Structure formats: C-alpha cells, structure tokens
C-alpha cells in the first residue's frame, strides 16, 4: 500500500487554502489556481459534493466557477433543483427582481437555504456584470409539483382548469410529507393522477394544435409528467433502487434538453449523481450523460473529505444541525489514503490511477445523502467514478438559515 500512497502523493497537486475562500485576493492567486487545476476541454463538467451540507464544498465550487468561466465560454449552470423553481432564480439573477431567500425556500430543499449558496448566486451575478457574460441557471430535477402547476395554470383557457390546478395544489400541500418521501399511497396517487390528466391532456392538445412551439409550456409539461412518474406506486414499486435510477435517467434527459453542440455548461449535484459509474443504488445521471455524449465531452469532479462536520437534519435532535460528524475513514476507504499524503487540500486527476490501486486496497468511499446516515461509506472505486477529485481533509457544516 505504500506504493499506492506514493503514487497519490506524486499525482496530487496541493492547493492553497485561499481556494476555499471562493475569492482570489489578486491576479497572481487566480493564475496559481489556473496552473494547478487543469480540467482541459469539456462540454458538460459536473462538480459533485459528498454532502449537501458542507461549507468548504460550496466555496470550492465558487472558486471553480470563477476559474472555469475565464477559461471556457460557459453559458449555463445546472442545479439539482426543480426546473420550474429555478426559472424564478434566473429572473433574480438576470433582472435582479424577486426575494432570493423566498425563491430558495420554494425549492423545498433546505440545503440551498444557506449563506454559501447565496454567495454562489451573487458571484455568478458579479461575473455576468463584470465580464459581459450571460450565464444562467437551469434546474434538472423535478421533485416539486408546486411552481410547475402554477405555471401550467397560466395556460388554462377556462375556469375549470384553473380550479383543477388549485385542487391539486391543495391536495399536494396536505400530503406534502408523503410527497417529499415519494410515499404517496396508491389510492391518493390514483386520485391525483386523475385530476392531473384533466390539466395535462387539454394543454397537450393545445400545444400540438398551435403553429408556434411554446418551449416554456413543453418544459413544464415534461417536469410535471416526470414528477408523476417518480411518484407512481406502480412504477416506483416503493423501491429505492428503482426510484433512484428513474430519477437519474430523467435528470440526464433534462440536462441533454438544455445542451446543444458546442456549448459549455457546468452541473452542480451530489457526487452520487455526477459520478461516471453506478453507485450503491443504481446507474447514475453521470453514467447516462457519459453514454450520450462520450468521455471527452462529459467530465466530472468529485469533492471529498476525511473528517469534520456537516449540516443536515438530525432526527435525534429533530432539527437541522451543523455538528453532524464526518466519521474518520478506515483503511478500506479511499479517504484514509488521501489523509496519508499530508496535503490538506489537493487536486487529483484520476487518469492512470486505477491500475495503481491494488486488489487488496480500498474498495469504499464516503457518501452522505440527505439526513444523517448510520453508514457513511459505500462500496466502489472512487478513482473510476470521477475524472478529478478535490480532497479537503477537514470540513465544516454550511451556514444554513435554519440554524438561527
């Protein structure tokens, strides 16, 4: 294993702590980042994270965005958030209208409701203003029905359709706890689906008969139909693996609908979605994108850590806390060996590294989904899963608005 550690040490490029501030202090520091982090060409670059609640991961992403938009003509940043709600974020970004905190609250994903994501949005706004760019956000997830139904309501040509949408929103609000867990009962789903078809079918008919294609209507119909598919008990069978693969395959389709040849875009999502190999649950969004556009066009970065804390909903305390422990890795995990090379923050290109990983070496890596899992490690080869790794030895929980 000493040879494996030596190989890691030789290939890992140590990064300055300033990289985790999200802001270079001067041009020399920016140039230093650029020399050390060589991504090369890409069409879609996905930047992952081991948890949704880590302060340093947000800051590293901000630094990467600053770096990449100077090197590549990036025009879009995709978020693991519902498509319709992210359109409101774009309105804030491009026209400075709306309440950012309320927009983030509408995502119904508490991990976005934090100081660090606000900083990321404001950084993109500054980049657009200073460099004459028009980078926009888009969502590729579809787990919320609320904004998409309100969008579809605009297209109703009669009072009956608007009433049906209002009834659906009311029903989903009452069932919200089950909606967020994809645990709608078969009877409730049949009722919701019947009402939904009264909205979907006439709007689809109108869209087909129209001479002018309405991309906004089409996108919202797709999102709502994806939401229904994911929550259909006959399709998901209450099986985590089935739901996971369905969600990742549909997220990949949503990314590809936003993508056009020659375009450069960045995706921000959990490591478990962006990695190129199957995870513990299913095939991943990254795997589907790799299959669709090829290894030279799809690239991914995994962000990892060995110790510290992360922010998440703690069921024992029944609230969101920033002191959930990142459990130090054992010798069967890749992070254990990352800690051995004495580089607190490093960038690691994984090309050529897989062959150096001995059969008796690590076969696990950390995965922290929503909440506080009892087991923080899953089986897999981290070096095969990502093109690049940025490892941050010690991390802290992000500054959630719910901590105050």
PLM region spans:
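Structured catalytic-domain cores with a bias toward divalent-metal coordination
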Residues: 1-404
């Amino acid at each position: 294993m000493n040879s494996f550690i030596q190989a890691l040490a030789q290939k890992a490029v140590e990064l300055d702590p300033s990289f985790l501030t999200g802001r270079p202090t001067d041009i020399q520091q920016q140039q230093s980042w650029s020399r050390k982090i060589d991504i090369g060409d890409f069409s879609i670059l996905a930047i992952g994270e081991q948890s949704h609640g880590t302060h340093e991961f947000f800051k590293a992403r901000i630094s990467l965005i600053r770096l990449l938009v100077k090197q590549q003509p990036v025009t879009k940043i995709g978020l693991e958030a519902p498509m319709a709600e992210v359109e409101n974020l774009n309105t804030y970004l491009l026209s400075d209208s709306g309440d950012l905190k309320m927009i983030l609250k509408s995502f119904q994903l508490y991990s976005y409701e934090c100081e660090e994501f606000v900083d990321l949005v404001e950084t993109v706004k500054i980049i657009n203003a200073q460099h004459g760019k028009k980078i926009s956000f888009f969502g590729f997830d579809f787990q919320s029905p609320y904004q998409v139904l309100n969008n579809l309501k605009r297209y109703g040509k009669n009072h009956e359709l608007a009433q049906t949408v209002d009834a659906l929103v009311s029903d989903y609000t009452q069932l919200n706890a089950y909606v967020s867990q994809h645990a709608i009962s078969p009877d409730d789903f049949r009722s919701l689906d019947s009402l939904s078809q009264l909205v979907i079918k006439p709007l689809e008919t109108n869209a087909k008969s129209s001479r002018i294609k309405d991309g906004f209507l089409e996108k919202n119909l797709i999102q709502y139909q994806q939401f229904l598919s994911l929550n259909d008990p006959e399709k998901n069978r209450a099986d985590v693996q089935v739901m996971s693969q369905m969600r990742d395959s549909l997220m990949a389709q949503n990314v590809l609908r936003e993508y056009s040849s020659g375009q450069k875009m960045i995706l921000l999502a959990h490591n478990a979605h962006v990695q190129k190999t199957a995870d513990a649950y299913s095939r991943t969004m990254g795997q589907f994108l790799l299959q669709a556009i090829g290894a030279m066009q799809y690239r991914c970065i995994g962000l990892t850590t060995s110790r510290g804390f992360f922010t998440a909903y703690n069921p024992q305390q029944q609230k969101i806390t920033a002191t959930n422990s990142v459990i130090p890795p054992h010798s069967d995990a890749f992070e254990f060996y990352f800690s051995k090379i004495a580089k607190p923050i490093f960038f690691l290109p994984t090309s050529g590294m897989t062959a150096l990983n001995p059969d008796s070496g690590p076969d696990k890596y950390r995965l922290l989904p929503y909440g506080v899992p009892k087991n923080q490690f899953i089986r897999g080869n981290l070096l095969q899963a990502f093109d690049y790794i940025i490892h941050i030895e010690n991390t802290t929980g992000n500054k959630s608005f719910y901590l105050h």
